[in-house]
């Protein structure tokens, strides 16, 4: 059998390996000349193999997400009213600003409270804020901010408030079926590529609606059509599960977040944390929950103990002790991260889904977090 027929029968290319490499390098060079450097590359040549993240401000949620909000991706946070959606994004903005980053808030609902934002650690003096008149204006502003590659995080509050220009200019009662969905679909096609290139994290807040005529299954859906669901790398479903009280006085809520979609880490994890009125996410509360689950802090009855010494009776008193002893809290955080890196089992129902993602999350989280806190 001739050599050519043998090659064809075996399915191999008759050209030598050197010729194939030369042809490949030639076409790669041609593509880069036509479309710019970085338009095509080997995955192993990429400068960042692991997706960088932004802390959410809640250690339990960071673990559930595999480190935090991914950079250069679209994130959607949805849930009922007063469930903590805006609080989550303000904490993310504060974390970005702590590291010298630039943040923008597109306030389509015209409801941003600068006093509350400042109480959560947001540098309101340097926060970029836009209150657009139309949905088109809002999304065009987002696109220009992303294209600049000078902004680290952009928050849009909310998709439901992105009203198309035609609807605003029309009369009350005029039908505009599907106009917002078309607007979002066009915008996502346009800005998603730029988001990836710039490394900017774009977070959309969204509201819930009920589908009519659903007898079986979940009747809830989000506004703005299906485009955002597809383009988002992370989707978070946040719910208020408990109201926190001291006597008859309400001072916060217990929130539960389900990772409904995650393209950069295992999905369907669940995290719980406290949101205190006027103060935001209780970071020490998150730390205490994980410290108890990993065995760093032991609870017997109502008493919590650390290294054999009782540190507080009841959860609130223990958190107060941690506030008064910041060095001990830093040490506890270091021990918790070490335990999670080693793959410690997490026993409580609220934390079970985090155990399997612990190693991934600890590896993706910034290694200097505890050291920076100590400094």
UniProtKB/Swiss-Prot annotation:
Entry's localization field? Cytoplasm
Does the keyword DNA repair belong to this entry? Answer: yes
Q: Where is this region: Disordered?
A: 1-20
* Classification via InterPro entries: AAA+_ATPase, DNA_recomb/repair_RecA, DNA_recomb/repair_RecA_CS, P-loop_NTPase, RecA-like_C, RecA-like_N, RecA_ATP-bd, RecA_C_sf
Q: Give the GO terms filed under biological process for this record.
A: DNA recombination; DNA repair; SOS response
Pfam families documented for this protein? RecA, RecA_C
A Gene Ontology MF term for this entry? damaged DNA binding
- Chief location: cytoplasm
Recorded GO cellular component terms are: cytosol
Q: Where does this protein hold ATP?
A: 79-86
Keywords, comma-separated and alphabetical: ATP-binding, Cytoplasm, DNA damage, DNA recombination, DNA repair, DNA-binding, Nucleotide-binding, SOS response
Signal peptide segment: none
Job of this protein? Can catalyze the hydrolysis of ATP in the presence of single-stranded DNA, the ATP-dependent uptake of single-stranded DNA by duplex DNA, and the ATP-dependent hybridization of homologous single-stranded DNAs. It interacts with LexA causing its activation and leading to its autocatalytic cleavage.
Q: Which family does it belong to?
A: Belongs to the RecA family.
What name has this protein been given in UniProt?
Protein RecA
Source species taxonomy: Bacteria, Bacillati, Cyanobacteriota, Cyanophyceae, Synechococcales
């Amino acid at each position: 059998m001739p050599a050519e027929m043998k090659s064809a029968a075996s399915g191999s290319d008759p050209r030598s390996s050197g010729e194939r490499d030369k042809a490949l390098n030639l076409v790669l060079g041609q593509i880069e000349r036509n479309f710019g450097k970085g338009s095509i590359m080997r995955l192993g040549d990429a400068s960042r193999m692991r997706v960088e993240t932004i802390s959410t401000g809640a250690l339990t949620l960071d673990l559930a997400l595999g480190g935090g909000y991914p950079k250069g991706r679209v994130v959607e946070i949805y849930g009922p009213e007063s469930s903590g959606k805006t609080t989550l994004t303000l904490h993310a903005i504060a974390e970005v600003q702590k590291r010298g980053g630039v943040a923008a808030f597109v306030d389509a609902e015209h409801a941003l409270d600068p006093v509350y934002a400042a109480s959560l650690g947001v540098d309101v003096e340097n926060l970029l804020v836009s209150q657009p008149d139309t949905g088109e204006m809002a999304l065009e502003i987002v696109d220009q901010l992303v294209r600049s590659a000078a902004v680290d995080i952009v928050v849009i509050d909310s998709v439901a408030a992105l009203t198309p220009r035609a609807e605003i200019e029309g009369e009350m009662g005029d039908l505009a079926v599907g106009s917002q969905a078309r607007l979002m679909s066009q915008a996502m096609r346009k800005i998603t590529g730029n988001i990836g290139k710039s490394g900017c994290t774009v977070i959309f807040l969204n509201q819930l609606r009920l589908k009519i005529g659903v007898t079986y299954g979940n009747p809830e859906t989000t506004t703005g059509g299906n485009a955002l669901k597809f383009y988002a790398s992370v989707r978070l479903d946040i719910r208020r599960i408990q109201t926190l009280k001291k006597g008859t006085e309400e001072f916060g809520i217990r929130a539960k977040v389900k990772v409904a979609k995650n393209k950069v880490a295992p999905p369907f994890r669940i995290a719980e944390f406290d949101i205190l009125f006027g103060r935001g996410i209780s970071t020490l509360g998150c730390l205490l929950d994980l410290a108890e689950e990993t065995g760093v802090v032991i609870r017997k009855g109502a008493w919590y103990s650390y290294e054999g010494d009782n540190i507080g009776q009841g959860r609130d008193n223990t958190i107060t002790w941690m506030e008064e002893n910041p060095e001990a809290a830093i040490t506890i955080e270091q021990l918790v991260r070490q335990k999670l890196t080693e793959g410690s089992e997490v026993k409580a129902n609220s934390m079970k889904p985090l155990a399997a993602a612990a190693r991934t999350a600890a590896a993706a989280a910034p290694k200097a977090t505890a050291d920076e806190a100590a400094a």
